[in-house]
Regions:
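Signal-transmission linkers at sensory-effector interfaces
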Residues: 1-33, 44, 66, 186, ...
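Regulatory loop-to-helix N-cap segments in sensory/regulatory domains
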Residues: 2-10, 144-161
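Amphipathic alpha-helical "output/dimerization" segments
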Residues: 17, 133, 151-169
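AAA+ ATPase active-site-proximal loops
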Residues: 35, 192-212
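GAF sensory/regulatory domain recognition
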Residues: 40-43, 52-79, 105
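Acidic/proline- and glycine-rich, intrinsically disordered low-complexity segments
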Residues: 73-98
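Signal-transducing coupling segments at domain and membrane junctions
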Residues: 73-74, 101-125
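A short, aliphatic-rich beta-strand micro-motif
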Residues: 124-133
Length: 213
């Protein structure tokens, strides 16, 4: 009898988490508003000590952390990768989940954010799943667990994959908005450079000299 209670409790917690996430996404598909509460809900229901959402910029190929639970702003800023680099980069490259049972034992785990420096890395497990629509991978959702834990890491992979599929549409909208913003910034920078070159003193003097010839 007792043996059957634990799985039922776990399933109930999962349903509560997925229902809470669906409510968040019903309120908004703006990832800036949705992803923070989603990752916070993961921490509350799954017991994760950290969670991150990383997005890939399809123009530059850079992967950066867009939202996180348990990371400071400076740690988020340090979380930048290329496709295929580290666990997050590998997940985005392959489109397949990865589990690192102990981050201290896997050289692929880079700890680029520095968020695990204060912990015994042998006691931290890292789970990362792709966020995709069809075959297009847009980013990755990851979570840290402090060991030992009651629920198997495989169960967490399954649950994170479900959550990733739930937020995929919001991620696509956010990714497109970020890329459009980057395109506008690049165009603005290009125009500024052109204006600086056009109005350099040497260029202006040259034009005046030619006008008097």
């Amino acid at each position: 009898m007792t043996a059957g209670i634990a799985p039922m409790k776990r399933e109930l917690k999962e349903l509560q988490l997925l229902f809470e996430i669906s409510q968040i996404l019903d309120r908004t598909l703006d990832l800036r508003e949705a992803v923070g509460p989603v990752i916070d809900a993961m921490a509350a229901h799954m017991g994760t000590v950290r969670g991150t959402l990383a997005l890939i910029n399809r123009q530059t190929g850079e992967i950066s952390i867009d939202a996180a639970h348990g990371l400071s702003e400076s740690q988020k800023e340090r979380g930048r990768y290329r496709v295929g680099e580290g666990v997050t980069g590998k997940v985005i490259q392959t489109g397949r989940p990865m589990v690192v049972p102990r981050v201290s034992e896997d050289p692929l785990f880079l700890n680029r954010t520095g968020a695990r420096d204060g912990l015994k890395k042998k006691d931290v497990a890292f789970i990362c799943v792709p966020i995709k629509i069809g075959t297009e991978v847009m980013g990755a959702l990851s979570a840290d667990h402090v060991l030992p834990k009651e629920v198997s890491l495989e169960e967490d992979v399954r649950l994170l994959t479900i959550i990733g599929s739930m937020i995929a549409q919001a991620v696509r909208l956010r990714q497109s908005a970020q890329e459009e913003r980057q395109k506008l910034m690049d165009e603005n920078r290009r125009l500024q450079d052109q204006l600086k070159e056009k109005f350099r003193p040497a260029n202006i003097i040259g034009k005046i000299g030619r006008a008097h010839v």
